[in-house]
Amino acid sequence: MNETNHSRVTEFVLLGLSSSRELQPFLFLTFSLLYLAILLGNFLIILTVTSDSRLHTPMYFLLANLSFIDVCVASFATPKMIADFLVERKTISFDACLAQIFFVHLFTGSEMVLLVSMAYDRYVAICKPLHYMTVMSRRVCVVLVLISWFVGFIHTTSQLAFTVNLPFCGPNKVDSFFCDLPLVTKLACIDTYVVSLLIVADSGFLSLSSFLLLVVSYTVILVTVRNRSSASMAKARSTLTAHITVVTLFFGPCIFIYVWPFSSYSVDKVLAVFYTIFTLILNPVIYTLRNKEVKAAMSKLKSRYLKPSQVSVVIRNVLFLETK
């Protein structure tokens, strides 16, 4: 009987961000701090929104959900990448690789749809302010969040369906710090040209359609407020600037990686770091530094849990223990 298959690949080797041993400690420290900043920044937003009744509005409800998804996006691969900086051979099992593919498309797909929901929320708030609380009821907000997760699940299931049955029997080196779908499919033992086209079509449709909806929403808002007072125009511009910045930083790398046909591995690797790490750090900064309500709520939260009298007592106790 002839052997019909080569030995099946049971693990993949991740080449990581850099092959330089000298850079590994620096990269370990840098990305550990960045990941910690992502967790602290986004969990702070979630805590602030949930603890302050003044922020129990549709906009901040969606913002808190965005922060939660940002934590998920940062956590699907970053801890593994940080741990890999400490080892020479960076491997990941076949099942764990598929899990990374599943989660990255689930979370990023959900975030794209949620950003569209946030743009719709701003459209209703600015263009139809008298009907805002009726249109953006709590039930509608919950439905919008559930839709974002549902679309993300459908998107990632369809993407994973292209990969799970591919035969992997030869090369197993992935030139990235996580199992990126386009890179993994190219390692299959068969011609994956059609599969690659389906992957691009799936990701491209979700990315481009979401991005176009966002562009249309923001354009309508800007046209609507153009003839209003300078004060309302300034407030609308401030809000839109924050949203547009987040959208550009998130969608730009995703569209370039999955839609642009002339990208290279080195460029894709940098862009992957951008939308899985750097953008997620900027989101809390962008949304809080430009928002007086969030900053006021954070100050109130700090005064509640970090009272000067309590801090001084802790300091005195520490000094007393040190002098004993």
Curated annotation (Swiss-Prot):
Membrane topology designation: Multi-pass membrane protein
One GO cellular component, as annotated: plasma membrane
Cross-referenced InterPro entries: GPCR_Rhodpsn, GPCR_Rhodpsn_7TM, Olfact_rcpt, Olfactory_Receptors
Residues annotated as transmembrane: 26-49, 58-79, 101-120, 140-158, 196-219, 236-258, 270-289
Record-annotated disulphide pairs: 97-189
Residue positions the entry lists as glycosylated: 2, 5
Extracellular face of the membrane: 1-25, 80-100, 159-195, 259-269
Domain of life: Eukaryota
Compartments (UniProt record): Cell membrane
Residue numbers on the Cytoplasmic membrane side: 50-57, 121-139, 220-235, 290-324
Gene Ontology MF: a single term: olfactory receptor activity
Keywords recorded for this protein, A-Z: Cell membrane, Disulfide bond, G-protein coupled receptor, Glycoprotein, Membrane, Olfaction, Receptor, Sensory transduction, Transducer, Transmembrane, Transmembrane helix
Role, per record: Odorant receptor.
Family: Belongs to the G-protein coupled receptor 1 family.
Name recorded for this polypeptide: Olfactory receptor 4K15
Origin species: Homo sapiens
